[in-house]
Curated annotation (Swiss-Prot):
The keyword Metal-binding does not apply. SUPFAM superfamilies: Snake toxin-like (SSF57302). This is Cytotoxin 11. It comes from Naja annulifera (Banded Egyptian cobra). GO terms for molecular function: toxin activity. Disulfide bonds join 3-22, 15-40, 44-55, 56-61.
Amino acid sequence: LKCHNTQLPFIYKTCPEGKNLCFKTTLKKLPLKIPIKRGCAATCPKSSALLKVVCCSTDKCN
């Protein structure tokens, strides 16, 4: 699996074994959904009051 790991959409890394999800974290309050954190995960991180987390399982989907 390949996941983006920076705010730039053309930079990505190959996830280590066991991390089969990509995630993207954005701030809920901003009108522009600029990712503040991206990467690989074994389980999907939880969203919070300020942060929205979206997970997916295909190459470069985050």
